[in-house]
């Protein structure tokens, strides 16, 4: 390369870096409204305008108490006491203290009535008991929660209330706040999965533990955990009450005072509380156009504390999307009586503007990081993963379960890597991006509406123009320049490769059917040891083979050798279809059979 060409490249690189540094230090600027509008247009095309937001709104204690009275169809002494306690709640800590003690007294009275009754399933008594105990726990001070005890007055007698979590019964709970799930109104989820039974249905909030080796894999927002609170032991003469927080996904029945009780639980509220705290409308935009600003949001995130006995379901979203696209599927898995005991949901979020091979390398590094973190924490390794990918996420998933051989390299270059002009860092980058093997920690894959042979949508003017707005991190730009531009004379002579040598391609460019990545990814074979399933949208077309979901053609989403295939009469947002959810639940239950388990 001539010195003048090198100077021009260096000037362009500096200008690009300056543009990135000026772009959105804290959010989108006024001058970027055109890009935001373009992002929203792309989102409408890619996601079909499907709603992905979750909203959680608190309900007042009085409104919830009134609803309980109306639901019971009668106003008894207990329902009246419940309403009176609710009326006391307010912003005054002293008044809340009185309400707290009234809730506790009411919960104890109803618990005594339930134990004395022959019929344990009295819905009115159970409702009042559960909500009174839930409201009591919500009013506990942070100081009481921190030490796991509270001094209370019951019938004029001083009582020590001891709070314990069933996960670690010998230690105080590590929760920062307890929220009564019944007092939250949820919008944005198709269903709310609640199991009736004994127990105050709680959302237990927990700040990510920054010391733990697994802290980087907890959700950036407060972790929300489902628990059901019960009176494990009540001894008023001795001045002691023990309240146990039970994980309802693991415990369906509990023995108290010599009798077995069905444990209730709210399995949707904790996930809704997580989803309502995210700001993915701007993060999706940054993930496509301004990847440097998405760096602190990338990664694999556990939606619940790690459990080595549960199988991870790892969900990978597509271009210009976010984990919230999986909200209803995640909710159904968490609400299913069988799957909630056997599976834990993990979400992978990433900047979707990166070249596809780069995004795949980052996912492999994240999976390796999880394994290393578990080992450092002294925890057992995770169960074999069920990997689910939609659209671009399906391409990443396929690269986790395939052997690249030389297929990808040969689409770009005519000579082996050792004949290129590469620095050691570039050689390492090439080795990890263009060459890979099937992972041994994945047991099954589900591909949804994935463009294995590319998508003609990427050739549309709107998408081509959008790709010009994508800005890579400087380090990646320099890798791409040194690997491709410096070695252009060794590249396979094609229109697409000439474009790559001239301008760094985004994921949008590389989704075009003629791109070298699309050609290579279409040739990759899923490892025979890993069963896979297809879910394909087929809304448009005169026949199955000529149909498409409006974005991806059936012929591009189809892979030979699938264990099953479901063709859904819907658009590209096939993830939102109840038929898709039913199929995923079927596959997950199939995966539980002994012959389908293991690495």
Residue ranges and their predicted role:
Residues 35-47:
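Bacterial N-terminal signal peptides
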Residues 49-313, 322-328, 344-347, 376, ...:
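Flexible, membrane-associating and regulatory peripheral segments of lipid-active enzymes
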Residues 88-89, 93-101, 105, 112-124, ...:
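Serine-dependent carboxylesterase/thioesterase catalytic core
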Residues 327-343:
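Short amphipathic alpha-helix adjacent to the substrate-entry channel of hydrolases
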Residues 471-599:
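C-terminal subdomain of alpha/beta-hydrolase-fold enzymes, centered on the catalytic histidine
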């Amino acid at each position: 390369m001539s010195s003048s060409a090198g100077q021009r490249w260096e000037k362009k690189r500096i200008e690009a870096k300056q543009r990135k540094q000026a772009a959105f230090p804290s959010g989108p600027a006024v001058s970027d409204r055109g890009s935001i509008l373009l992002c929203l247009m792309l989102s409408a095309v890619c996601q079909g305008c499907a709603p992905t937001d979750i909203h959680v709104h608190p309900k007042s204690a009085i409104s919830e108490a009134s609803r309980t009275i109306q639901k019971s169809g009668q106003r008894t002494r207990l329902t009246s006491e419940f309403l009176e306690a609710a009326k006391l709640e307010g912003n005054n800590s002293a008044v809340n203290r009185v309400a707290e003690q009234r809730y506790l007294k009411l919960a104890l009275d109803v618990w005594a009535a339930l134990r004395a009754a022959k019929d344990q399933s009295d819905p009115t008594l159970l409702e009042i008991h559960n909500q009174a105990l839930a409201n009591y726990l919500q009013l506990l001070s942070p100081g009481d929660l921190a030490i796991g005890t509270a001094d209370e007055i019951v019938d004029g007698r001083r009582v020590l209330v001891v709070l314990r979590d069933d996960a670690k019964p010998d230690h105080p709970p590590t929760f920062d706040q307890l929220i009564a799930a019944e007092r939250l109104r949820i919008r944005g989820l198709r269903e709310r999965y609640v199991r009736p039974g004994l127990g105050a249905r709680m959302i237990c909030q927990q700040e990510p533990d920054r010391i733990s080796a697994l802290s980087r894999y907890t959700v950036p927002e407060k972790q929300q955990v489902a628990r059901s609170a019960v009176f494990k032991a009540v001894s008023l003469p001795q001045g002691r009450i023990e309240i146990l927080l039970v994980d309802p996904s693991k415990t369906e029945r509990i023995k108290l005072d010599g009798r077995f009780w069905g444990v209730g639980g709210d399995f949707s509220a904790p996930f809704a509380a997580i989803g309502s705290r995210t700001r993915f409308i701007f993060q999706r935009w940054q993930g496509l156009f301004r990847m440097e600003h998405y760096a602190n949001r990338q990664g694999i995130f556990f939606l619940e504390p790690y459990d080595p006995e549960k199988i991870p379901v790892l969900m990978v979203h597509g271009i210009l999307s976010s984990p919230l696209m999986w909200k209803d599927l995640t909710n159904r898995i968490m609400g299913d009586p069988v799957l909630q005991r056997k599976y834990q949901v993990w979400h992978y979020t990433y900047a979707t503007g990166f070249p596809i091979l780069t995004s795949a390398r980052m996912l492999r590094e994240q999976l390796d990081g999880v394994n290393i973190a578990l080992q450092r924490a002294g925890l057992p390794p995770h169960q074999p993963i069920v990997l689910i990918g939609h659209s671009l996420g399906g391409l990443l998933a396929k690269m986790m379960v395939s052997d690249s051989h030389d297929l990808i390299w040969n689409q770009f270059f005519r000579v082996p890597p050792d004949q290129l002009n590469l620095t050691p860092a570039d050689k390492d980058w090439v080795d990890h991006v263009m060459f890979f093997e099937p992972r041994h920690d994945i047991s099954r894959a589900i591909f949804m509406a994935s463009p294995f042979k590319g998508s003609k949508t990427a050739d549309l003017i709107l998408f081509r123009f959008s790709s010009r707005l994508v800005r890579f991190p400087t380090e990646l730009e320099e890798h791409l320049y040194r690997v491709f531009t410096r070695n252009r004379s060794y590249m396979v002579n094609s229109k697409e490769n000439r474009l790559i040598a001239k301008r760094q391609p985004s994921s949008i460019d590389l989704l075009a059917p003629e791109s070298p990545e699309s050609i290579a990814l279409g040739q990759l074979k899923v490892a025979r040891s890993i069963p896979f399933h297809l879910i394909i949208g087929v809304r448009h077309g005169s026949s199955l083979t000529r149909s498409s979901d409006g974005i991806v053609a059936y012929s591009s989403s189809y892979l030979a050798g699938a264990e099953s295939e479901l063709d859904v009469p819907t658009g590209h947002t096939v993830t939102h279809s109840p038929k898709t959810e039913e199929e995923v639940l079927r596959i997950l239950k199939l995966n539980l059979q002994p012959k389908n388990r293991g690495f």
